[in-house]
UniProtKB/Swiss-Prot annotation:
Keyword Transport applies: yes
Organism: Simian immunodeficiency virus agm.vervet (isolate AGM3)
Region (Homomultimerization): 13-21
Functional description taken from the UniProt entry: Escorts unspliced or incompletely spliced viral pre-mRNAs (late transcripts) out of the nucleus of infected cells. These pre-mRNAs carry a recognition sequence called Rev responsive element (RRE) located in the env gene, that is not present in fully spliced viral mRNAs (early transcripts). This function is essential since most viral proteins are translated from unspliced or partially spliced pre-mRNAs which cannot exit the nucleus by the pathway used by fully processed cellular mRNAs.
GO biological process: mRNA transport
Protein name: Protein Rev
GO MF annotations in UniProt: DNA-binding transcription factor activity; RNA binding
Lineage of origin: Viruses, Riboviria, Pararnavirae, Artverviricota, Revtraviricetes
Assembly description: Homomultimer; when bound to the RRE. Multimeric assembly is essential for activity.
């Protein structure tokens, strides 16, 4: 499925968010490194949740638009009145 301009923009936004949270440096005591990794993991979890919300909101919008289009298409359909079947006598 080719990506549209809106999807590319969302992916660039998500990539930008991930780029701004680099892995912590290997400096400091073991406790400092452990705390830095813990804070980094927490930030990564928040970024993943945010990215998921951003992406799924777009998917939900597309789904709502598709459903609306189906409803409009169905409104144009008309049921034809069929004649009564012949009776066998």
């Amino acid at each position: 499925m080719p990506l549209g301009s809106e999807e590319r923009r969302l992916l660039r936004l998500i990539a930008f968010l991930n780029k701004n949270n680099p892995y912590p440096p290997v400096e400091g005591t073991a406790r400092q490194r452990r705390r830095a990794r813990r804070r980094w993991r927490q930030a990564q979890e928040q970024l993943r949740a945010l990215a998921e919300r951003i992406w799924h909101s777009r998917v939900e919008e597309q789904l709502v638009q598709a459903i609306d289009q189906l409803v409009l298409d169905q409104q144009h359909l008309a049921i034809q009145q069929l004649p009564d079947p012949p009776s066998s006598s």
